[in-house]
Amino acid sequence: MNMTRAAEFTAELIRTTSRGLAGLSTARLFEKIDGAETRYGEGGFDSWRQALSARLEALASALEADDTKLFADDMVWFRAVITSREIDAKDVGLALESMRETLTAQLPGTTDGSIDRFFDAAVKALAEPAT
């Protein structure tokens, strides 16, 4: 394992605060989607918060393993799940953007770009057509 102390700290911080970070990320996401409350209904916010909490856990695991593909693959899998429920795949990209913005704003040590390569890998993977 090639994890640096900074990556180890960031992964632990994400795990410890994933529920709160997921809530903030979901709030950002809902600001980006016109009519999100109507589209996703009464339990929509909580469903997205739970889903983004799981994505943040995947990011923490990817950080610990120093494996960008691990996070990218999780986001591609998530897109498959979301689109199977007839939800626009674009919302997954917006969710990824919202998580990145939230982590950069909320976590110490992430403004140096240390998590960017994980998000960049996920963006690249999501740009590929779904199979």
Segments the model singles out, each with a brief description of its role:
Residues 1-93, 97, 102-131:
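Core of compact, soluble alpha-helical bundle domains
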